[in-house]
């Protein structure tokens, strides 16, 4: 399966908190933003682990144990372009975090999880700041869907959009 990523930490933050503006997060409510280092770094670590632990089958295992990335062409959809999206391919039925750990990359250098504590008010404030940075549904979904999502959020969050 393909896992969607973005090259922008602000877009990642938007996707992490975008649904929480309508919920009142109680104690212990968190959203998560995951950080992924350059895939060349991860793949080099995976290869060195294979050389160290299974040198006889290096060529065979290297083909199977590298994280593959897919960068879509701009012509596919404007949505992927505006989200700075790319995808990683992982084995079916396995989370990327588990797959990396199973292949010798279990430390915190490979995937960084940033836990963002939130309340309804803090998420609304965060979304207001992100929209001032031009990160909102209208720019992330450049079509009717984005305009409708923006309007629905703007009705409920005071000062969300400069037009309202």
Model-identified regions with their sequence ranges:
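Catalytic-core elements of nucleic-acid end-processing and repair enzymes
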Residues: 1-164
